[in-house]
């Protein structure tokens, strides 16, 4: 169980050891399948791809909480990745793991999000055709970086309209 599997092993070994862990778990008698949750794109462990392709116990399921695709918004959200890196990650997953199921979550209405940022996100969703997608409106929560430093400047009605537009596109 982890909030971000991408970092497994970095604390003790200075590198990802996720593939090694998953191989060990898959070898255990009685384990029928393994589904890995939450790979943040900035530190994706690419060595897991061959294992997911080769081992039928490891589900070809990727839960990637991308949040946004606009480089400007990714920087504002402190996501430590870029649009180009994200698109390359998705391309590699689909190429190296045929039949992969990719799920993501997106966040709209983050402080400073413009209509142009949102349109870029909408176009990205249209192009990628995720198997599963969730989208949430930004919520100005106490104790967060954005709450302390940024103004919640996107009206709630705009946030809700953006959620609806993305979900309508995803479901079409």
For each predicted feature, which ranges?
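Conserved SAM/AdoMet-binding glycine-rich loop
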Residues: 1-115
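A structural motif corresponding to the C-terminal lobe/cap of the Radical SAM core domain
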Residues: 57-60, 72-172
């Amino acid at each position: 169980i982890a909030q971000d599997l991408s970092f497994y092993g970095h604390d003790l070994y200075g590198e990802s050891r996720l593939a090694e862990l998953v191989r060990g778990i898959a070898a255990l008698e009685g384990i029928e399948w393994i589904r890995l949750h939450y790979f943040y794109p900035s530190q994706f462990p690419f060595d897991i791809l061959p294992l997911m392709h080769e081992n039928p116990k490891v589900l070809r399921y990727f839960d990637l909480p991308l949040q946004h695709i606009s480089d400007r918004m990714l920087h504002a959200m402190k996501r430590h990745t870029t649009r180009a890196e994200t698109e390359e990650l998705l391309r590699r997953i689909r190429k190296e793991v045929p039949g992969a199921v990719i799920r993501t979550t997106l966040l709209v209405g983050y402080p400073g999000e413009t209509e142009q940022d949102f349109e870029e996100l909408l176009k990205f969703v249209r192009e990628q055709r995720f198997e599963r997608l969730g989208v949430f409106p930004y919520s100005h929560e106490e104790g967060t970086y954005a709450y302390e430093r940024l103004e919640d400047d996107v009206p709630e009605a705009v946030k809700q309209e953006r959620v609806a537009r993305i979900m309508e596109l995803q479901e079409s």
